[in-house]
Amino acid sequence: MSYTFSTYETLALASLVLLLGYFLVKRINVLKTFNIPEPVVGGFIVAIGLLIWHKIDGTSFNFDKNLQTTMMLVFFTSIGLSANFSRLIKGGKPLVVFLFIAALLIFGQNVIGIASSMALGIHPAYGLLAGSVTLTGGHGTGAAWADTFAHQFNLQGATEIAIACATFGLVFGGIIGGPVARFLLNRQKQGENPENDEVDDIQEAFEHPTYKRKITARSLIETIAMISVCLLIGQYLDVQTKGTALQLPTFVWCLFTGVIVRNILTNIFRFQVAESAIDVLGSVGLSIFLAIALMSLRLWELAGLAIDVLIVLAIQVAFMAAFAIFITYRAMGKDYDAVVLSAGHCGFGLGATPTAIANMQAVTSRFGPSHKAFLIVPMVGAFFIDLINAALLKVSFAVVNILA
């Protein structure tokens, strides 16, 4: 038996999931102490409830994917609209360093996946499937490569395993980012900032998700218009480039379109973009997207994972936490920005870029802004990382072919 939630039902439940997350994080000290994002808390609890329901009578639940996709695109578009070219240029050396670190993580994930699977006596392709293809790559990349695994290595249930591995990574990417940041902050003895201080419009978007904003009806309408135009252009470019060398995920086109539109308006037409409205709409899009993504998790699919693959994934989670603490944090300067970047790296290193942003928001809402982190992570996680992952996966495939 299967039940599909309508658009309105999905939106209503996602909103309740977020409110549940806010309620629990505010009242349960351990969740607040370790900076666990509210959508992860609420969404995971609902996912567990649906798992119990599924075990009782076998009912599966489906949610409106169009709403989830739209909220994701709104979020990435708002990231683009919040970026000035002058800020992008400032990314400079730290951006290159973080990109190199992200590539190093991909290499490490694949080495650990292959080595662990061989030590456990299973086909090394299973270890590779529990590596960067599903962790750094996420559900989309994992599902896209699953057929290749099935045909090239004759793996049984490759698609199901890929989705389950990506689900595992998404959950733990949202869980370990906060504790990693907490551990590093304790080293620095970083104090909290008040949560309800007002911030002005020149503050970077997304860094203060709980702070008050000054928004007018006009600024909100102008921002909705900008986002709508960017979504339209991004979707058009996605359709036009499909099957070509320029093919990219839709959200990347929307992000780049947002950057172009923002800088044309700011630098040519001298239009003052309402950062506060972009911030609010982007944060709302991110929260609703994550809530739907988390409550859509079919946790019973994890039960289908072989114990050997689960062991490989557990090793990957420990490796990600250690990598963020000893590599990402140190390479990015061992300062507060490096702490926030480390939390974000846990998010997209195991899950997805929205999870990374949620991890960073959970930190910055309590300990202060990090302009560098909110500039670098979306750029690397949303675009560059997929290209690097694809290139390194081809090398890993060749290695598995030799070892198999």
Curated annotation (Swiss-Prot):
Alphabetical keyword list: Amino-acid transport, Cell inner membrane, Cell membrane, Ion transport, Membrane, Sodium, Sodium transport, Symport, Transmembrane, Transmembrane helix, Transport
Pfam families (alphabetical): Glt_symporter
Sequence intervals crossing the membrane: 5-25, 33-53, 69-89, 95-115, 161-181, 219-239, 245-265, 277-297, 307-327, 338-358, 373-393
GO cellular component: plasma membrane
InterPro entries for the chain: GltS
Main location: membrane
Location in or out of the cell: Cell inner membrane
Reported function: Catalyzes the sodium-dependent transport of glutamate.
Family named by the database record: Belongs to the glutamate:Na(+) symporter (ESS) (TC 2.A.27) family.
Protein name: Sodium/glutamate symporter
Native organism: Haemophilus influenzae (strain ATCC 51907 / DSM 11121 / KW20 / Rd)
Chain's gene name: gltS
